[in-house]
Regions:
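Class I S-adenosyl-L-methionine-dependent methyltransferase catalytic core
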Residues: 2-175
C-alpha cells in the first residue's frame, strides 16, 4: 500500500487526507523504489489502491516490472463500531471501497482456487488494511517468501519494510 499523495481540494479535506496521517510519496518516488530488484523472477504483486490512483497504478506496476492480471480484492468498508457501510472521502462519490490489484512477473504458481475477491470488513486506523487480505494472499500463494512494503506490523512469515516497523531489508531509491 504505497503512501499515495493526493490533491487536496479544501481545508476541511486536508485534515482527513493521507498527508495528515503519515508522509506520502509522489508517483515518481513510488516508481523509483527498487521493487523489481527485490522481487523473485516468478512472483505476484498485490497493490492496494484507491480509485483516484487507478491510472497511476498501471505506471507503478510497469516501472516495477509487473503485468496486471486482475483485481485480487475489493474491500467493502464497514464502520468501526457497526456493520453499516463506512463513508469515506471523495470528490464525486463518497468512497467506501478499496481495491487490491494483482500483477505478476514470470510464472508464479497459484496454491488455492477458492480464494474469494470481496472482503467485507470494518475499518481500523487510517489506511490499515484488513487482516483477512493477508490470510487470503497466504492461501492463494502458499508457503513462499513474502514481503510487505510500507508495513505497519510484522506478521509471522512475512518480511517487512516501512517507517512504522523495524524493517527486515533496506531499500535504496533510484532517483
Amino acid at each position: 500500500d504505497p503512501p499515495w499523495a493526493y490533491k487536496v481540494w479544501s481545508k476541511k479535506g486536508a485534515g482527513r487526507s493521507a498527508e495528515s496521517h503519515y508522509p506520502t510519496m509522489d508517483i515518481a518516488a513510488i516508481k523509483a523504489l527498487p521493487v523489481g530488484e527485490l522481487a523473485d523472477k516468478d512472483c505476484a504483486l498485490f497493490l492496494w489502491i484507491t480509485f483516484p490512483m487507478l491510472r497511476e497504478a498501471w505506471g507503478v506496476m510497469d516501472a516495477w516490472g509487473f503485468t496486471f492480471k486482475t483485481v485480487a480484492f475489493v474491500w467493502i468498508k464497514q464502520c468501526r463500531k457497526s456493520d453499516g457501510l463506512f463513508t469515506g472521502m471523495g470528490y464525486w462519490t463518497r468512497a467506501n471501497a478499496e481495491i487490491c490489484l494483482l500483477a505478476t512477473r514470470g510464472h508464479p504458481k497459484r496454491a488455492a482456487r477458492d480464494v474469494k475477491q470481496v472482503i467485507l470488513s470494518h475499518v481500523e486506523r487510517h489506511s490499515q488494511k484488513p487482516e483477512e487480505a493477508r490470510r487470503r494472499i497466504e492461501a492463494l500463494m502458499g508457503d513462499v517468501p513474502r514481503i510487505e512494503l510500507f508495513a505497519r506490523a510484522s506478521p509471522p512469515g512475512w518480511d517487512v519494510w516501512g517507517n512504522e516497523v523495524a524493517s527486515d531489508i533496506r531499500l535504496a531509491e533510484r532517483m
